[in-house]
């Protein structure tokens, strides 16, 4: 039983499935464990039912979900969701993707370290990242481009003559410490936002992961919905293969038990929009044709950072959701190499 926030649903279901599997395996003679009851608060119900609908049929049939009231006195059985019901949920379509333009100031900053600095666009300006680590923000106010810098968003300084030395010191420290050649691997600049560092490398050339992927357009930190009521998080990368198949890419650089269920839920969200034609109409991939097939899921992690329970959890997912595991080199900061790729469910 659990009362928690929707964002914790993957952790809850992952740990529960592993406990259920291990306990069932230990019992070699009757009475066998035949059902898994999940008792949750109302806030967790919808995201949990969405994920249970993605499990393989035999396992899904063993699970019953109940909602407990706030006084923890009454249980109400929840009706399971069939897969087809997932596609009936109302969804807002995506707005058309505007052409990305880079301001003069942003171009000048990128030119100081073009292999390290990239830009993330938003409606209200541009965020500059050094190997994925945000360090500056550029906005145009009353026709004048202004730059704010600093790693702490709440304490960024406006770049002017009085702060020029601080700006130069920040760039110097980033060059020294946020580098694959950095000597001090314990430095905060080296350790911070590691997954964003990996994402930034793949954004530059996604074919390092799969030569069949199209380099651009490639969407990073892609949001299929707004708000966090159901624990909605952005997808690390949304890509398109040369054969027209969409690909959901989820990155991890440390062991994470939730990797599999996160990837499966991202598949559900992208597939719901694909079926409605939202992705094609928004021209997320320009005029390239998107195949009428569900997306693939690529789960990426360094070889020694894959969670020990990864395979067992992957085998809980329905086989029509194509999930692939990509093991990459441990020293990926110096360049990404795929060491192994395999279908896991």
Task: Label every PLM stretch briefly.
Residues 1-345:
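Charged, terminal alpha-helix-loop-beta segments
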């Amino acid at each position: 039983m659990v009362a928690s926030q929707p964002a914790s649903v993957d952790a809850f279901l992952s740990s529960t499935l592993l406990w259920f599997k291990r306990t069932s395996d230990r019992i070699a003679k009757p009475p066998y464990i035949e059902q898994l009851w999940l008792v949750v608060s109302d806030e967790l119900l919808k995201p949990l039912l969405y994920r249970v609908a993605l499990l393989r049929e035999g396992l899904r049939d063993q699970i019953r979900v109940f909602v407990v009231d706030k006084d923890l006195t009454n249980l109400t059985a929840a009706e399971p969701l069939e897969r087809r019901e997932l596609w009936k949920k109302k969804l807002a379509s995506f707005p058309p993707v505007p052409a990305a333009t880079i301001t003069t100031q942003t171009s000048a900053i990128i030119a100081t370290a073009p292999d390290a600095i990239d830009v993330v666009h938003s409606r209200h300006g541009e965020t500059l990242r050094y190997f994925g680590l945000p360090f500056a923000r550029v906005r145009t106010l009353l026709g004048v481009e202004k730059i704010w810098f600093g790693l702490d968003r709440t304490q960024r300084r406006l770049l002017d003559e009085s702060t020029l030395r601080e700006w130069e010191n920040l760039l110097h420290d980033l060059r020294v410490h946020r580098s694959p050649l950095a000597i001090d691997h314990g430095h905060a600049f080296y350790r911070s936002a590691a997954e964003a560092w990996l994402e930034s490398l793949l954004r530059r050339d996604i074919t390092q992961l799969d030569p069949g992927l199209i380099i651009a357009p490639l969407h990073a930190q892609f949001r299929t919905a707004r708000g966090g009521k159901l624990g909605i998080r952005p997808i690390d990368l949304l890509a398109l293969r040369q054969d027209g198949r969409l690909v959901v890419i989820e990155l991890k650089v440390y062991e994470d038990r939730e990797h599999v269920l996160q990837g499966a839920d991202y598949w559900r969200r992208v597939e719901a929009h694909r079926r409605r034609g939202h992705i094609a109409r928004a021209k997320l991939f320009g005029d390239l044709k998107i195949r009428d097939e569900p997306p693939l899921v690529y789960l990426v992690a360094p070889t020694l950072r894959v969670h020990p329970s990864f395979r067992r959890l992957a085998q809980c997912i329905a086989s029509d959701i194509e999930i692939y595991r990509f093991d990459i080199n441990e020293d990926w900061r110096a360049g990404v190499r795929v060491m192994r790729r395999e279908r896991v469910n």
